[in-house]
Design a protein with these regions (language model features):
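Conserved switch/coupling elements of ABC/ABC-like ATPase nucleotide-binding domains
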Residues: 216-221, 225-226
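Conserved ABC transporter NBD signature motif
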Residues: 63-75
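Helix-to-loop junction immediately C-terminal to a conserved catalytic motif
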Residues: 55
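Conserved ABC ATPase signature
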Residues: 138-142, 146
Length: 275
């Protein structure tokens, strides 16, 4: 399999049902080696569900998904995942290094001891995430930003071709946010494909190569510079043309009938406003 295949993502006509309700429909999305793609949308829009579907944790009702050249869950050696921070048990008495090593479990195998390559991968991941000096510290002693970097290091320990990040900027201070932004851009420049969900619209517009507006389906998918039509943002977030959000993302101005970027051809999605 080529490097370009390992860094690729292809989602075609995806639909997902959860609890008997359709939460995603007609999702079409692609990413290539070295892309940095941001998924933006309101709470409940399906952003995390898209990531979980790519991981094989959610089964599609319809459509196809290929990540790192394989079906979801099949290419796990090449996929790293950073969940939302609250999903980790931070009160568990374990060191930073041990958490990062846990990211190598599938590579090591169950009930087997880590080898030299595993220790090298963990050391490199800790250094990349700026956590090498805290390797022996218990995770319960860490700040919010440090905890986020531990989860990123754990994902990097797999040496992924594709890195999926769920709300990586939530609850971190400005220096950590700047450090993470620099890290993500560097990883992308080195050929890692990154897909992140975030509510930090300013950060996403300043950092991502492409922005995908999501509300149960793909509303628009383009570069930040091209997503200046307020109509796309109004439809995604259910806001009026006078909303301050439009100024925040640089989309304030007359509402035009044409849509910037690549608009979804599916029927207009209902606006999700809660998780």
């Amino acid at each position: 399999m080529s490097d370009s295949d390992l860094g690729s993502i292809r989602i075609t006509n995806l639909a997902v049902n959860l609890g008997g309700l359709q939460v995603l429909h007609d999702v079409n999305l692609t990413a290539s080696k070295g892309d940095l793609l941001a998924l933006l949308g309101p709470n409940g829009a399906g952003k995390t569900t898209i990531l979980r579907t790519m991981l094989g944790l959610v089964r599609p009702a319809r459509g196809s998904v290929t990540v790192a050249g394989a079906a979801p869950g099949r290419g796990w050696r090449h996929v790293g995942y950073v969940p939302q921070r609250h999903e980790f048990a931070w009160d568990f008495p374990i060191s930073v290094a041990d958490v990062v090593m846990s990211g190598r479990t599938h590579h090591i195998g169950w009930l087997r001891h880590p080898g030299k390559d595993d220790h090298v991968a963990v050391r490199d991941a800790l250094r990349t995430a700026g956590m090498a000096d805290l390797a022996d510290r218990t995770v319960g002693e860490l700040s919010g930003g440090q905890r986020q970097r531990v989860l990123i290091a754990r994902a990097l320990a797999t040496r992924p071709s594709v890195l999926l990040l769920d709300e990586p900027f939530t609850g971190v201070d400005m220096p950590t946010q700047e450090m993470l932004t620099e890290l993500f851009c560097r990883l992308a420049s080195e050929g890692t494909t990154l897909v992140m969900t975030t509510h930090d619209l300013v950060q996403a517009m300043a950092t991502a190569d492409r922005v995908c507006l999501i509300n149960r389906t793909v509303i628009a998918d383009s570069t930040p510079e091209e997503l200046r039509d307020p109509t796309m943002w109004m439809r995604t977030f259910g806001i009026s043309e006078n909303s301050p959000l439009l100024t925040t993302v640089g989309a304030a101005g007359p509402v035009a009938p044409s849509h910037a970027g690549r608009a979804a051809s599916a029927p207009e999605a209902p606006v999700a406003t809660s998780a």
